[in-house]
């Protein structure tokens, strides 16, 4: 009998109950006792195993993006960008790559309502012929902070108060009053876009700046954008309360039901390109994650389409155990010196090893669909079948060679060690420009949300003044409206 033929799978279920080791269980209703009413015996192995397994069903919750839903499908190239990248999965129009996508809220717990004002995660895992490529983004194109050094503190401020376990505005506004770079992100979060109607009707963004490299080795900065074909729809406050009160999992249900009904969600992928030699020509730093690249001077280029046409088979196996990491790239795609991306490269893989163990990439949704080979052996929960005798490199008994070299960004870097801010902060221009694109009623809702947040009794006069000063620098009329309604004079 081949012990590897019947790997753990519901496809090999027996018609009767068994233990985890396969022994038949003739009674799954009653514990083993001394007589009818006597004490339970410790030798009741099935009972002990059943309880022990139940006690360990939960794994550590994601520190962010805990609440989410996943679906599977494909990505198809529709436009030729082979002159920009040598990535195999982007090699020509018509090429399809299987994907799994996870949508999520960011700050709140695993069972929290999907109608809370919060950014949404939009993570795509491409199972390419050259390994997995994880494009791990959000529904907003910018972020709160530009340096990953601030990320743990930022999350602590957004998370509930450690004393009361209640999310409180005064903590959020206190922290971000020290970081005017966050204004641009708040023009999205406190806008109508802050509560998407569901996952199907929201945009996605890679957020960080990456690098595309072609066969000749030419590198160009790139940003990725997902646009839903069914349009963008959001919930206003009253609608969110009504929808969330009826079903706290409404977005998960909408995604699942839509796919089940054959109404497959679809997004178009666009990119923006900047040549590294041109990065100093703008009034912002292209590697600053708090900035967008203006589409009027850096137009969107169509690339392909993402279609989700299959629901996951098991929520725990393909959502809770699904793990993304921005470090997972393929030839033709590389990182940039975006400070937030650089820290995400380490942090994501580290948290997955904590959550799922050192061999998390062996789990089915995380494992590559292409052949692969290395000497990363053993470790906790290693279930990969291996029969090699050589687990070192190099060896004449197992002459595994290096892969063909692929191009990486060519620049030579020089500089002194330092901890410093970027030169072009320019924190107020883009937030002001975005606010001025809002229709008057949309501006009014934005102002009302800020008045409500700044009216928190624990927000001090100093913090209110700082925020009004920030918004005045972004847009004078916005600052005046806030100052008037809060009866606070801005501190410039």
Curated annotation (Swiss-Prot):
Protein name: Catalase
Positions of transmembrane segments: none
UniProt lineage: Eukaryota, Viridiplantae, Streptophyta, Embryophyta, Tracheophyta
Highest taxon above the source species: Eukaryota
Signal peptide as annotated in the record: none
InterPro entries in the record: Catalase, Catalase_AS, Catalase_clade1/3, Catalase_core, Catalase_haem_BS, Catalase_immune_responsive, Catalase_sf
EC main group: oxidoreductase
Stored SUPFAM superfamilies: Heme-dependent catalase-like
One GO CC term on file: cytosol
Function comment: Catalyzes the degradation of hydrogen peroxide (H(2)O(2)) generated by peroxisomal oxidases to water and oxygen, thereby protecting cells from the toxic effects of hydrogen peroxide.
SMART domains: Catalase (SM01060)
Record's catalysed reaction(s): 2 H2O2 = O2 + 2 H2O
One GO term of the biological process aspect: response to hydrogen peroxide
Active site: 65, 138
């Amino acid at each position: 009998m081949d012990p590897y033929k019947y790997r753990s799978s519901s496809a090999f279920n027996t018609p009767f109950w068994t233990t985890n080791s396969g022994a038949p269980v003739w009674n799954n209703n009653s514990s083993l006792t001394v007589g009818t009413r006597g004490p339970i015996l410790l030798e009741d192995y099935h009972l002990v195993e059943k309880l022990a397994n139940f006690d360990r069903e939960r794994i550590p919750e994601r520190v962010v993006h805990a609440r989410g839903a996943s679906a599977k499908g494909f990505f198809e190239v529709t436009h030729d960008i082979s002159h920009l990248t040598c990535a195999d999965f982007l090699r020509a129009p018509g090429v399809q790559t299987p994907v799994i996508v996870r949508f999520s809220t960011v700050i709140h717990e695993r069972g929290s309502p999907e109608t809370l004002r919060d950014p949404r995660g939009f993570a795509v895992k491409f199972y390419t012929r050259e390994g997995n490529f994880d494009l791990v983004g959000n529904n907003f194109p910018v972020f709160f902070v530009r340096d990953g050094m601030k990320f743990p503190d930022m999350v602590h401020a957004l998370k509930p108060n450690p004393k009361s376990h209640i999310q409180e505005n005064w903590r959020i506004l206190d922290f971000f009053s020290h970081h005017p770079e966050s204004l641009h992100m708040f023009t999205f979060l406190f806008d109508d876009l802050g509560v998407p109607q569901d996952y199907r009707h929201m945009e996605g963004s890679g957020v960080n700046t990456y690098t595309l490299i072609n066969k000749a080795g030419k590198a160009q900065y790139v940003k990725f954008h997902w646009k839903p074909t069914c349009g963008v729809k959001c919930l206003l406050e009253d609608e969110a309360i009504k929808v969330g009160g009826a079903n706290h999992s409404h977005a998960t249900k909408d995604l699942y039901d839509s796919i089940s009904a054959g109404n497959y969600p679809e997004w178009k992928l666009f990119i923006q390109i900047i040549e590294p030699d041109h990065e100093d020509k703008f009034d912002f730093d292209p590697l600053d994650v708090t900035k967008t690249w203006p589409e009027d001077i850096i137009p969107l280029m169509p690339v392909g389409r993402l279609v989700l046409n299959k629901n996951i088979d098991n929520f725990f196996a393909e959502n809770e155990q699904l793990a993304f990491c921005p470090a997972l790239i393929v030839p033709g795609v590389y990182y940039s010196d975006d400070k937030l991306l650089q820290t995400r490269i380490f942090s994501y893989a580290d948290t997955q090893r904590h959550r799922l163990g050192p061999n998390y990439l062996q789990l089915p949704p995380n494992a590559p669909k292409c052949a692969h080979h290395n000497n990363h052996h053993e470790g906790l929960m290693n279930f990969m079948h291996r029969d090699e005798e050589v687990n070192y490199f190099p060896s004449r008994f197992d002459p595994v060679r290096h892969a063909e070299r692929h191009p990486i960004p060519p620049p030579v870097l020089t500089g002194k060690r330092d901890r410093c801010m970027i030169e072009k902060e320019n924190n107020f221009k883009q937030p002001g420009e975005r606010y001025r694109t809002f229709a008057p009623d949309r501006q009014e809702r934005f102002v009302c949300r800020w008045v409500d947040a700044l009216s928190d009794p624990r927000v001090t006069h100093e913090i209110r003044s700082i925020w009004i000063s920030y918004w005045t620098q972004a847009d004078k009329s916005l600052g005046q409206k806030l100052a008037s309604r809060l009866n606070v004079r801005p501190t410039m």
